[in-house]
């Protein structure tokens, strides 16, 4: 019984010693150690962990960095996770220990520096220099050749490399030149409308009413009774003078240069009017009849009464 117990104890003793050697290994302090066996078929196993104080320090630092940087774990890519821990296996296969190099802390520091503006004051951009570069100063030191532009008669003329003295001389010559005379605008000519000569309508001859003359002859008869007998004789006035007066009036009217057609129409109108006046007059007597009447009346007046002859 005791031998078996001692045998078990002797078997367990090297294991405890092996664990102590693993705990005292220097490379495994403060980090998680991954050990790989020399055999190909064997998988990775967790052998030992750091002390509780080291784990708490790492956890507090990680929590502080994550809270200040406000990083989301979902945004971390697969490549960044690969760069966190790089494992370099040792040369000796007997110890079966590995040296691990952690790249997590520099990454956290860089991320804290880059994302500091999320929790604190924003990072100022680098100042932009206002002063021009030396190349621009060199290029601007060479002045451009002066140009002379002249607008003349609707055309634009540009001359290169003109000295200021020449430009001033040209301007003085242009200013001292003869002043442009104002262009006299042609006067608008008045349109002359050739109108027909306005002539007064021909004055119509005055209508002569037939004059009726009454010839009264008083014959005193010396009779026994002493009775005087008045024998008034009414003679019809002659209208022959009216025709002569009308012809004289027509001759006195001014002759107007009218077309032949108007003259002919006017003559026809006057003839018809004269005929109407003559036909309408109630006492129409020819010249011959009027002369005979006058001679007869004169003879009657001059002759003595018939009863005196007896």
Swiss-Prot record:
Ranges spanned by the short sequence motif Nuclear localization signal, renumbered to the chain: 261-268
Tify domain sequence ranges: 141-176
Disulfide bonds: none
PANTHER family documented for this protein: PROTEIN TIFY 4A-RELATED-RELATED, PROTEIN TIFY 6A-RELATED
Family statement drawn from the similarity comment of this UniProt entry: Belongs to the TIFY/JAZ family.
Gene this protein is translated from: TIFY6A
Protein name: Protein TIFY 6A
Upper lineage: Eukaryota, Viridiplantae, Streptophyta, Embryophyta, Tracheophyta
Record PTM text: Ubiquitinated. Targeted for degradation by the SCF(COI1) E3 ubiquitin ligase-proteasome pathway during jasmonate signaling.
Domain text: The jas domain (259-284) is required for interaction with COI1.
UniProt GO cellular component terms: nucleus
Keywords: Jasmonic acid signaling pathway, Nucleus, Plant defense, Transcription, Transcription regulation, Ubl conjugation
Subunit text: Homo- and heterodimer. Interacts with MYC2, AFPH2/NINJA, TIFY10A/JAZ1, TIFY6B/JAZ3, TIFY5A/JAZ8, TIFY9/JAZ10 and TIFY3A/JAZ11. Interacts with RHD6 and RSL1.
């Amino acid at each position: 019984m005791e031998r078996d117990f001692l045998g078990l104890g002797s078997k367990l003793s090297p294991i405890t010693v092996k664990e102590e050697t693993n705990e005292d290994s220097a490379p495994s302090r403060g980090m998680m150690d991954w050990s790989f066996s020399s055999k190909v078929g064997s998988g990775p196993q967790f052998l030992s962990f750091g002390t509780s104080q080291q784990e708490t320090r790492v956890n507090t630092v990680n929590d502080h960095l994550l809270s200040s940087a406000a990083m989301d774990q979902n945004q971390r890519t697969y490549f960044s996770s690969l760069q966190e821990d790089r494992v370099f296996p040792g040369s000796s296969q007997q110890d079966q220990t590995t040296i691990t190099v952690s790249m997590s802390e520099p990454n956290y520091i860089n991320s804290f520096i880059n994302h500091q503006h999320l929790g604190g004051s924003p990072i100022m951009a680098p100042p932009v220099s206002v002063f021009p570069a030396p190349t621009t100063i060199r290029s601007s030191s060479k002045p451009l050749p002066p140009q002379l532009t002249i607008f003349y008669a609707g055309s634009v003329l540009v001359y290169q490399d003109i000295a200021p003295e020449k430009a001033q001389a040209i301007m003085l010559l242009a200013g001292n030149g003869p002043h442009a005379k104002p262009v006299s605008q042609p006067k608008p000519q008045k349109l002359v409308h050739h109108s027909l000569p306005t002539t007064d309508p021909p004055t119509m001859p005055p209508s002569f009413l037939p004059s009726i003359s009454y010839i009264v002859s008083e014959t005193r008869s010396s009779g026994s009774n002493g009775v005087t007998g008045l024998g008034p004789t009414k003679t019809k006035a002659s209208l022959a003078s009216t025709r002569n007066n009308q012809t004289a009036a027509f001759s006195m009217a001014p002759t107007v240069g009218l077309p032949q057609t108007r003259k002919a129409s006017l003559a026809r109108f006057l003839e018809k009017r004269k005929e109407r006046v003559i036909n309408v007059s109630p006492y129409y007597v020819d010249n011959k009849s009027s002369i005979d009447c006058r001679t007869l009346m004169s003879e009657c007046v001059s002759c003595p009464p018939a009863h005196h002859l007896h």
